Amino acid sequence: MPEYRSSTTTKGRNMAGARALWRATGMKTEDFSKPIIAVVNSFTQFVPGHVHLKDLGQLVCREIEAAGGVAKEFNTIAVDDGIAMGHDGMLYSLPSREIIADSVEYMANAHCADALVCISNCDKITPGMLMAALRLNIPAIFVSGGPMEAGKTKLSEHKLDLVDAMVIAADSSASDELTEEYERSACPTCGSCSGMFTANSMNCLTEAIGLSLPGNGTTLATHSDREQLFLTAARRIVDLTKRYYQDEDTSVLPRSIASFKAFENAMTLDIAMGGSTNTILHLLAAAQEAEVDFSMTHIDHLSRKVGQFCKVAPNTPKYHIEDVHRAGGIMAILGELDRAGLLHTDVPTVHSDTMKDALDAWDVMRNNDPELHKFFKAGPAGIPTQQAFSQSTRWSSLDLDRENGCIRSAEHAFSKEGGLAVLYGNIAEDGCIVKTAGVDESILLFKGKARIFESQDDAVKGILNDQVKEGDVVIIRYEGPKGGPGMQEMLYPTSYLKSKGLGKACALLTDGRFSGGTSGLSIGHCSPEAAAGGAIGLIEEGDEIIIDIPNRGINVSLTPEQLKARRQAMEAKGADAWKPAQPRPRKVTTALKAYALLATSADKGAVRDKELLK
């Protein structure tokens, strides 16, 4: 049977020094025959999605040790994309994903950890830890901090979130008093922001890919039910670890669970729930770590056959993550996908032998167990707090309306085509992404004149100064992984377009990316990016752009000969080719330059180019 990795540091006379150091951490002689399980926490006081995690790592550690393991906790970094948004701080967000993945690898390999419990929550932390778990391929389980409760003002029952606060702040007709009311009400509790933004999307996808427990993506951070998820994850990782090292059961390893079929399940869920476009970036990156051939081509194929079964903020103001939980959570969406013949149910998970077994136990539409239904009745208390597990409020009933409710059946889907689509054309030969769930039907086919901005900062100024008019296609380029560097999110430009009344009258195209809070005709991840020689860098002011979502097309009205001539003119610039026309007042540090040096375009997940490392 496989030997514990940790035995490298705990066995043999020559490891007396290592054992002495282990003893200094509290280990005893009898512990040297047990698995050492790394509890990878991400507590920080900078991020509301992580501010409540400080004591949860030790909660998991105690339960691991009660179950027969040795637990050792460490923390990764965590960047708050909302706080880093709209300034140079956003340059660091996506690169932090690689640092998180590397830090988990460094700690786990340096200390020969046998398994991982990944306590994640927000935008880059879950994907970073997922990449690390698949890279290491040792037993692992994910348990996130949980979603925030949706906010609301005292004056209205209308639910609020972070994006509402951003939009109203840019609306000159809104009073200072109303703006402050939104600001104070939008984010009332600890947890990841309350809509189907990137953090919640990724935590939901860990359920579909099989590496977290049912309820992980939707049980509120404040609810007492979430404590049981942490305790169960702790006990489960000890079982998974013993199954691998003692029983030689390789089916429990992350790469066995996160197979091609599992990635298809995750992407199918993402499309069905209208998740953040960032999830595509992160799933592509995770697939590379898992050595799974999963690409934009596969995503495009799925997007054409999967409908939208769930619609949540920012795609509608009616529902937030707490409402998805009330409707049965992610297992309920997966159940509807299964009934529609769109799910692989023969794949294993960390909690069930197969996804079919998981659905039989956890889908509220096929299991009437009162305890199961009680679990999904967990709801918000409406009490501002930074304390985990601080309330036990429950809805009086579940939302089981599959015709008009938050989660729909295939027959009554919000739309027959899903919430995400891949577009191709002479602007994006390797593809770009649009969240169709947030696009009004009236602009699914859009023609407009290009309005060029060579940084997000210039675009924000242009929008606020009324330089963008109805019918324009805002082009924000040189903001990709290399060009930014760091592939900034464009939430402020899209929010300001809304505040100017242009949300349904303009399009936005970028080689950067969008926040999970973005809606409207916002097209990102344009690949290849401008800095890598992509055609988005050849578009000129006033060019006609044609966006055809039904036919998955995006093109500039230029002939191949015209594009070739522009490319030759660009390349004739030598060292100044594929750079912004004017230098940007942007401080790019050595750390960011190092990231840019190896970064691939978005169609590859913006991961490091391994060919450059050979």
UniProtKB/Swiss-Prot annotation:
Superkingdom of the organism of origin: Bacteria
Active site: S515
Binding site for Mg(2+): D81, D123, K124, E489
GO terms classed as biological process: isoleucine biosynthetic process; L-valine biosynthetic process
Record's signal peptide: none
EC number, UniProt record: 4.2.1.9
Family statement drawn from the similarity comment of this UniProt entry: Belongs to the IlvD/Edd family.
Classification via SUPFAM superfamilies: IlvD/EDD N-terminal domain-like (SSF143975), LeuD/IlvD-like (SSF52016)
Pfam families (alphabetical): ILV_EDD_C, ILVD_EDD_N
Cofactor note: Binds 1 [2Fe-2S] cluster per subunit. This cluster acts as a Lewis acid cofactor.
Binding site for [2Fe-2S] cluster: C122, C193
Organism: Hahella chejuensis (strain KCTC 2396)
UniProt modified residues of type N6-carboxylysine: K124
Molecular-function annotations in GO: 2 iron, 2 sulfur cluster binding; dihydroxy-acid dehydratase activity; magnesium ion binding
Cofactor: [2Fe-2S] cluster; Mg(2+)
Function: Functions in the biosynthesis of branched-chain amino acids. Catalyzes the dehydration of (2R,3R)-2,3-dihydroxy-3-methylpentanoate (2,3-dihydroxy-3-methylvalerate) into 2-oxo-3-methylpentanoate (2-oxo-3-methylvalerate) and of (2R)-2,3-dihydroxy-3-methylbutanoate (2,3-dihydroxyisovalerate) into 2-oxo-3-methylbutanoate (2-oxoisovalerate), the penultimate precursor to L-isoleucine and L-valine, respectively.
Subunit structure: Homodimer.
Record's protein name: Dihydroxy-acid dehydratase
Catalyzed chemical reaction(s): (2R)-2,3-dihydroxy-3-methylbutanoate = 3-methyl-2-oxobutanoate + H2O; (2R,3R)-2,3-dihydroxy-3-methylpentanoate = (S)-3-methyl-2-oxopentanoate + H2O
Pathways involved: Amino-acid biosynthesis; L-isoleucine biosynthesis; L-isoleucine from 2-oxobutanoate: step 3/4; Amino-acid biosynthesis; L-valine biosynthesis; L-valine from pyruvate: step 3/4
